[in-house]
Curated annotation (Swiss-Prot):
It comes from Escherichia coli O8 (strain IAI1). Its cofactor is Mg(2+). InterPro entries: COD_ChbG_bac, Glyco_hydro/deAcase_b/a-brl, YdjC-like. This is Chitooligosaccharide deacetylase. The keyword Transmembrane does not apply. It is found in: Cytoplasm. CDD domains: YdjC_EF3048_like. Its EC number is 3.5.1.105.
């Protein structure tokens, strides 16, 4: 039985090196989809590159942990910028949910202004959309706008309460990440999904060329290793051999 595989590269717009890596992994590899940071420092560069790569499906990478928000968010920003203190606020049940709702809508409209179309799907930087307080907001928004949503079902206990019209892949994996990136790891992710019986699977990845912005990231050189693996001809063959068809959230 043929299965759908979505290979989504996060962080489109983070930096030029990230953008070039994603385009390379699409053009000469197995990346079929990406998600864009509309407040990223290289988002205009990402938009420009995407015009020459119409086969690349582009979704929105909702940002609440980096850079400047598009709306006033006094309850979440410090000195006008977003940061990882969102985890502390979540633990204290002190997230400004109305501000987050407004920021989601603003980033969505900004995406449409930049790319001239709706995003294929929605996910988030550092998976913040899976926070229990934020998840219902994002689910409702995606369902209303008719766009798909990345759902990590492992931490999710209320998946049965999702709207009937909400589209997502049956499976999602963030396991292709870390210091031990290899073709074998990627194929293990596929085999695990097959054993679960998932008929559609999204695999998250972060292929990039190294630039000064990426050097400042805690996750730096493995991005280049990811790029090497994702553009391997043998990996593409092994994926097809396992009965997977490459696609995007447009196929869900």
């Amino acid at each position: 039985m043929e299965r759908l595989l979505i290979v989504n590269a996060d962080d489109f717009g983070l930096s030029k090196g990230q953008n070039y890596g994603i385009i390379e992994a699409c053009r000469n590899g197995i990346v079929t989809s990406t998600t864009a940071l509309v407040n990223g420092q290289a988002i205009d560069h990402a938009v420009q590159l995407s015009r020459d790569e119409p086969s690349l499906a582009i979704g929105m990478h909702f940002v609440l942990t980096m850079g400047k928000p598009l709306t006033a968010m006094p309850g979440l920003t410090r000195d006008g910028v977003l940061g990882k203190w969102i985890w502390q606020l979540a633990e204290e049940d002190a997230l400004p949910l109305e501000e987050i709702t407004q920021e989601l809508a603003s980033q969505y409209l900004r995406f449409i202004e930049l790319f001239g179309r709706k995003p294929t799907h929605l996910d988030s930087h550092h998976h913040v959309h899976m926070f229990p307080q934020i998840f219902p907001i994002v689910v409702r928004f995606a369902a209303e706008e008719g766009i798909a949503l990345r759902i990590d079902r492992q931490p999710l206990s209320n998946s049965g309460d999702l709207p009937a019209n909400l589209r997502s892949s049956q499976g999602f994996s963030s396991a292709f990440y870390g210091e031990e990136i290899s073709e074998a790891l990627f194929l293990q992710v596929l085999d695990d999904a097959s054993h679960r019986g998932d008929l559609s699977l999204e695999v998250m990845c972060h292929p990039a060329f190294i630039d000064n912005t990426i050097r400042q990231s805690a996750y730096c050189f493995p991005r280049l290793t990811e790029l090497e693996v994702l553009t391997s001809a043998s990996l593409k063959y092994a994926i097809a051999e396992r009965g997977y068809r490459l696609g995007s959230y447009l196929n869900v």
